[in-house]
Amino acid sequence: NITRAEFAAIASRFMSSGYDVEEDLFTDIANHWARENINDAAMTKWINGYPDGTFLPDKAITRAEAVTLVNNVLQRKPDADHLLDSMIKWPDNMDTSAWYYEAIQEATNSHDYDLFDGAAYETWTSLLENRDWAALEKDWVNAHRTGGEVM
């Protein structure tokens, strides 16, 4: 398991510099080792806390929280009204009203998209073929072993 604090610390290292935060953004991180990382990631809107103002830094991060953070880092924001009916749907992600529904769909479906009129949210235009990443890695290793290229 990886904690919410550990994941925030990893993500905050993608930033070029930290934020100067005078007051913690969550009520339960004042003496935590990852306090600055958590504040930095929250300032960029990459992570969120809970409605009661806490972050729960030592709680194990969920799949939904992790993919939401990764999507935020990559600035990938799907619009539920513009997903494609033919996308892969997961048995444990069928509740379209769940806060994480779009984030899971974004992270698990390869697709092309458009951003219209400066919109922040993606309109999916087509699904891409799922790649066999294990086979691609094997081909890459073999090609580089002999000085060739893959793709």
Region annotations inferred by a language model:
Residues 1-5, 13-36, 47-64, 74-151:
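Feature responds to low-complexity, polar/acidic, surface-exposed segments characteristic
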Residues 44:
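Post-HExxH zinc-binding segment in Zn-dependent metallohydrolases
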